[in-house]
Curated annotation (Swiss-Prot):
This is Ubiquitin-conjugating enzyme E2 2. Catalyzes the covalent attachment of ubiquitin to other proteins. Mediates the selective degradation of short-lived and abnormal proteins. Plays a role in the DNA damage response. In particular, in response to ionizing radiation, associates with the E3 ubiquitin-protein ligase brc-1-brd-1 heterodimer on chromatin to activate E3-ubiquitin ligase activity of the heterodimer, and thus its DNA damage repair mechanisms. Interacts with the brc-1-brd-1 heterodimer following ionizing irradiation. SUPFAM superfamilies: UBC-like.
Amino acid sequence: MALKRIQKELQDLGRDPPAQCSAGPVGDDLFHWQATIMGPPESPYQGGVFFLTIHFPTDYPFKPPKVAFTTRIYHPNINSNGSICLDILRSQWSPALTISKVLLSICSLLCDPNPDDPLVPEIARIYKTDRERYNQLAREWTQKYAM
């Protein structure tokens, strides 16, 4: 079941890739993918290329994939291990969701952080109290780690 579904998603991604994103298997292992997300225009991540790993559980799509950034990023919902605080990767997962939709959700999280549900409270605090400084630090990290 999982393998068939993953193969279908891979085909769909090839036919209709989401904007600013790409993903595919690492070698022959269809349960382990690498993805890239281009820093969205008009965001402090613009111009950066961010790499992520995707691990599919054997009971996919009934359980969510494990998705993590391997590129460092300054963001209130993404910690230094690359873990992402995103409801659809946890409690709000649904088998109707696809990797394409997950990547688009992560892209929109880059444009619109959720400082009220932070993984990194300090970054969330700066985001809420000093947006200029947040944008500057996010740009610096993007230049340092993602270019």
